[in-house]
Amino acid sequence: MSTPGINWSRLVAWMASNVPDVGEPTGVSLISGGKSNLTYRIDTRAGAEDRALVLRRPPLGHVLPTAHDMRREWRVISALAGTAVPVPEPVALCVDEDVIGAPFYLMGHVEGQAVRGRQDVRLSPEDARALSERLAEILAAIHAVDYEAVGLADFGRPDGYMARQLERWGQQWERSKTRELPEYDRLAARLRDRLPAASRAALVHGDYRLDNTLVRLAPGAAPDIRAVVDWEMSTLGDPIADLGLTLTYWHDPGDDERSALPVAGDITLTPGFLDSRGFAEHYARMSGADLGDLDFYVAFGNYKLAVIVEGIHARFVQGKTVGEGFDEIGAAVPLLVARAHRALDEGL
């Protein structure tokens, strides 16, 4: 059995030794949609019972030094199991790179789908509003987690978080960039000059959006967010930075430029879905957060996303991406930089 990023025989042997209770692995398939860490479905059988697991591993090829840490993802979903934040069941972590060529972890398969575009699901206006409100409520729940009580007191350094984030993503840009973009350099300087006073410390997801959740869609029932996934950039930090990045992905009616960004789906254009400002206001009601500096955080979200997309583009140029949809992604970077400048100049 040949699947990019998986050494099947070694994985089967490791699972037999370390997680025999899940059954014998019978098949593997790449789950589509991921442009960062790779996600696979692992089918198993124990007696007459079939079960599905999910395996997460870093991407192939160019990998940034502080990104794609499987231990962090594993640790945070393990800590959140049993809290008000829905996450998949943690199953096992493997840090031995000899097994499949990189660290990985296994988690339970969640019945649900990543909803990105209107083609993925038909929603009534009532269901669209309920789903967007629930997305805001879960973000508030993440930020309300008592991170010390769940064992994440040392999961990050919230003091000076935004200043370090600006420095970190600037360094990542230098490592990943495939071209010179003077407007990116000007943006970095503007963000440093506009750095707001520190917000409260909270657990932050780092890449929160609807298609990083799994939504159960059942006939006759309202859509239900069953799990938040893709915790690779989670840490302790400023919760409004999480909100700002979510709004970076948001596609509002009349925003034609957003359609040119391959990193954004159009699910938020569904009639009834909250627009970006409505989403932010609902989050503020649920969390009690002060959104006075939200424009800065939206600009920072575009800045951060530009670096992430440039890293994906670099892997595509090297021929190291797995899956489809990478050929035009590099064109999104200058657009994201321009949108960040516009957020600073004009607001949300």
Give residue spans per PLM region.
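Juxta-kinase regulatory segment immediately upstream of eukaryotic protein kinase catalytic domains
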Residues: 1-22
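ATP-binding pocket architecture of kinase catalytic cores
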Residues: 25-203, 220-223
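All-alpha amphipathic helical-bundle segments outside canonical DNA-binding/catalytic cores
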Residues: 156-157, 289-301
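Catalytic-loop of the protein kinase fold
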Residues: 203-205, 210
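Hydrophobic residue at the +6 position relative to the catalytic HRD Asp in the kinase catalytic loop
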Residues: 213-215
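Activation of the activation-loop gatekeeper triad in protein kinase-fold domains
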Residues: 229-234
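Active-site activation/catalytic loop segments of kinase-like enzymes and analogous catalytic loops
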Residues: 241-287, 301-319
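Helical subdomain adjoining the active site within ATP-dependent kinase catalytic cores
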Residues: 289-293, 307-348
